Amino acid sequence: MENIPIEDQKWRRGQITFNRHFAASIKKMREMALSNKDYDPARLFKWGQMMSLALIRALKAVEKNLGAPGQKVINQVLIELGREIGQEVLRDFVRLPQTKDIEVVSKFVTYINEEIWASPEIPLIINDQECLCDVLWCPHQDHYQAFDCRVQRYIVQGLLEAFQEKTGIAVDAQFTQIIPKGAKTCQFHMRLISPQEEREWNKYSAQLAAKALEKLKEKSQNE
């Protein structure tokens, strides 16, 4: 198969154009690391996996030692990170006039999966209000327990907030199945909502946060 050069500045699919995040540092990485024939790209995975494990372990330690206030600080940091990345990706966002809102949503989700989570996916537009995708492989699937995946939800929350602010399109999200629970894919369902509607995504994240603290409370009582 012919290797097609990747444009590090822009990401284009059909009628949609986004910026690629971290473009300047990616250029440097290609020049100083990937251009070296002795450099194994799998090293990036191992480094990134270490950092992802550090994040979930840091969250658990903060929850154990500082409780709800500490948990809230970590979660807010992740939301803000998601917003920053989303704003960078959407800064020069372009859509052709005939593009439907759900097409924009579907392409943004593809960018999230492929470029932010490094995950191959199969997208599907169901109708003018809904779309979904099947994530075929997740970098965390062999290292995170199912409950650990909650840490990523706050980054997604920030991404969705940035998306609504830039495009005016309000969207909610739901995972219907995940690989760490034994499913073949992680399935991600998206639907358009009114701008005033609270996201079920955020509500469920709050439930998981409360559950994490409750687990710690039960564990301490049983020790």
Describe each PLM feature range.
Residues C133:
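Phosphate-moiety recognition in structured ligand-binding domains
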Residues M1-E130, P139-I155, A162-H189, I193-E223:
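N-terminal accessory segment detector
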